[in-house]
Amino acid sequence: MTDRTDADDLDLQRVGARLAARAQIRDIRLLRTQAAVHRAPKPAQGLTYDLEFEPAVDADPATISAFVVRISCHLRIQNQAADDDVKEGDTKDETQDVATADFEFAALFDYHLQEGEDDPTEEELTAYAATTGRFALYPYIREYVYDLTGRLALPPLTLEILSRPMPVSPGAQWPATRGTP
């Protein structure tokens, strides 16, 4: 998960809003994957996971009517551990990895500008990738993780719903923020 706050996500949504209003998804592909089981899960314990996203965008200035959003993912699945399961000098992360997976999805988007409208900036494209692009690819990421964990002979993992922060009314205080995926 990332250290971004709800306020950061809302700022990115505002920056990418013009693209979000005009872009349509045309194709989705899994570009690469590498997965490994490091140890069997402990039957008496549940599993927990950590999923990190790294969004990026590829756009050719000569054909700016289309762009590709890539989401690189790093998944770590661990045994849930009690504090007494950790040996001195080890961290829970070092002792509990059951499996890891690195994979990347890409989506092709196209859009149509209105007459006289400027091409999107790199900042708009990057903000779109981190917000709407991530939301567009997330159902495919969820399905892939569910399928992958089953194929690795692990209990199928259903990822949590990806949430979007709520806008705050003008003059209202920001609620306590937490990191979002």
UniProtKB/Swiss-Prot annotation:
Highest rank taxon of the organism: Bacteria
Residues bearing PTM N-acetylthreonine: T2
Annotated disulfide bonds: none
Induction note: Probably induced by the DNA damaging agent mitomycin C. Part of the Rv1954A-higB1-higA1-Rv1957 operon, as well as the higB1-higA1-Rv1957 operon, which is probably the mitomycin-induced operon; the former but not latter operon is autorepressed by HigA1.
Record GO cellular component, one term: peptidoglycan-based cell wall
Signal found in the keyword field: no
SUPFAM superfamilies named among the record's database cross-references: SecB-like
Gene disruption: observed consequences: Disruption results in slow growth. A triple higB1-higA1-Rv1957 disruption mutant has no visible phenotype.
Keywords associated with the record: Acetylation, Chaperone
Function: Chaperone component of an atypical, type II toxin-antitoxin chaperone (TAC) system. Prevents antitoxin HigA1 aggregation in vitro at a 1:3 chaperone:antitoxin ratio, probably also protects antitoxin HigA1 from protease. Required for neutralization of toxin HigB1 upon ectopic expression in Mycobacterium marinum or E.coli. When expressed in E.coli complements a secB deletion, restores export of OmpA and MBP and inhibits aggregation of proOmpC although it is less efficient than endogenous SecB. Complements the general chaperone function of E.coli SecB less well.
Family membership noted in the UniProt record: Belongs to the SecB-like family.
Assembly, per entry: Homotetramer, interacts with antitoxin HigA1.
Name this protein carries in UniProt: SecB-like chaperone Rv1957
Protein species of origin: Mycobacterium tuberculosis (strain ATCC 25618 / H37Rv)
Gene name, Swiss-Prot/TrEMBL: secBL
